[in-house]
From Swiss-Prot:
Binding residues for NAD(+): 48-53, 74-75, 111-112, 139-140, 244, 273-275
Its EC number(s): 1.3.1.9
Name recorded for this polypeptide: Enoyl-[acyl-carrier-protein] reductase [NADH]
NCBIfam families noted in UniProt: EnoyACPredFabV (NF043048), PRK13656.1 (NF010177)
Gene: fabV
Record's function text: Involved in the final reduction of the elongation cycle of fatty acid synthesis (FAS II). Catalyzes the reduction of a carbon-carbon double bond in an enoyl moiety that is covalently linked to an acyl carrier protein (ACP).
Subunit description: Monomer.
Disulphide linkage map: none
Pathway(s) annotated for this protein in UniProt: Lipid metabolism; fatty acid biosynthesis
Length: 397
């Protein structure tokens, strides 16, 4: 079939397998061009490995450090008449490239919140790798089914305490609007912590430890975002911030556990990037469009791949992790530079529908958004007939 993008709200309902592969190959080429990651990981588990920062982590580990990788994700394959999720095609493309390079790669497609998934992964590690020396936790899900009770808990992206009203982009109409979000109830706050906090990361690390599949000196990293005062009401001071604070709590406990065997665990705070997750948060598309323009002009722009590659080379496996007061790795250091943030603050009040394209990199935002789904990549013939049914070596639960 010939596949074109169909965008509804903050989701693209079609995906392009060849475009997704081109996107993965582009990221692989970036890491390879940087040369080997010295003293990098050798056996890596990535939980949430099919898109965004998780996919970038798997690529950096495999193609930067030559690591064997196991990736866990929850994606839908395509059929002859319907496209699968972008993450499915990304994972398939990664698997293909890894096999071509002679690298071990296995994938598990299932609910990473479930005990069954943990058990399957542990068996795979025991059977093929023995132990892992890096665990990357990069899940972004709005819903979590609790493993013991089966209860389904939903998160809420909301402010706390009062209504949040802000300037935002209506991405369907490319217009500046005023958006208001009602504050979260106490139950919504707790639910968001349950879904997006550190509890599941702890369950994974405990299960891996108890099964004896964590190598001495093993490291673990979970990803977070803090942002700036421009986004704090909806993010860091909202329900998401509470969940991310819980991630810090979990990190301290996991760090204590791993330290006994020479290992460590940290939250890595990353910069804002275009992902399916960030495009769902009011204010983020506008903020990202602004910060992209400013950071590109200053030559310090990074996407997921650039961020993770720099983190692995200079921090996680570098000479100095440069941790903050909460023992977090700060990869948002360039975005939070005073010159970048002050320019954002100055710009914010003056943006209108008419000057949106001139004052921000909204066109770059939209291009990046479509790339997530495999569209708008150089060298891909989008008028060609492609088969959406792509198969690869994956254990499906």
């Amino acid at each position: 079939m010939i596949i074109k993008p169909k965008v509804r709200g903050f989701i693209c309902t079609t995906t392009h397998p060849v475009g997704c592969e081109a996107n993965v190959r582009r990221q692989i080429a970036y890491t390879q061009a940087k040369g080997p990651i010295e003293n990098g990981p050798k056996k890596v588990l990535v939980i949430g490995a099919s898109t965004g920062y998780g996919l970038a982590s798997r690529i950096a580990a495999a193609f930067g450090a030559g690591a064997a990788t196991i990736g866990v994700f929850f994606e839908k394959p395509g059929t002859e008449t319907k496209t699968g999720t972008a993450g499915w095609y990304n994972a398939a493309a990664f698997d293909k490239a890894a096999k071509e390079a002679g690298l071990y790669a296995k994938s598990v497609n299932g609910d990473a919140f479930s005990n069954e998934c943990r058990q399957q992964v542990i068996e795979l590690i025991k059977q093929d790798l023995g132990q892992v020396d890096l665990v990357v936790y990069s899940l972004a899900s709005p819903v979590r089914k609790l493993p013991d009770t089966g209860e389904v808990v939903r998160s809420a992206l909301k402010p706390i305490g009062e209504v949040y009203t802000t300037t935002a982009i209506d991405t369907n109409k490319d217009q500046i609007i005023s958006a208001s979000v009602e504050p979260a109830t106490e139950e919504e706050i707790q639910n968001t912590i349950t879904v997006m906090g550190g509890q599941d990361w702890e369950l994974w690390m405990s299960a891996l430890r108890d099964a004896g599949v964590l190598a001495d000196g093993a490291k673990s990293v979970a990803y977070s975002y803090i942002g700036t005062d421009l986004t704090w009401p909806i993010y860091w001071h909202g329900t998401l911030g509470r969940a991310k604070e819980d991630l810090d709590r979990a990190a301290a406990g996991i760090r204590g556990d791993l330290a006994a065997h020479g290992g460590t665990a940290h939250v890595a705070v990353l910069k804002s990037v275009v992902t399916q997750a960030s495009s769902a948060i009011p204010v983020m598309p506008l903020y990202i469009s602004m910060s992209f323009k400013i950071m590109k002009e200053k030559g310090i722009h990074e996407g997921c791949m650039e961020q993770v590659d720099r983190m692995m080379r200079t921090r996680l496996y570098g000479s100095d992790m440069a941790l903050d007061d909460h023992a977090r790795i700060r990869m948002d250091d360039w975005e939070l530079r005073d010159d970048v943030q002050q320019t954002c603050r100055d710009l914010w009040p003056s943006i209108t529908s008419e000057n949106l394209s001139q004052l921000t990199d909204y066109s770059g935002y939209k291009q990046e958004f479509l790339r997530l789904f495999g569209f708008g990549l150089d060298g891909v013939d989008y008028d060609a007939d492609v088969n959406p049914d792509v198969q690869f070596d994956v254990v499906t639960l």
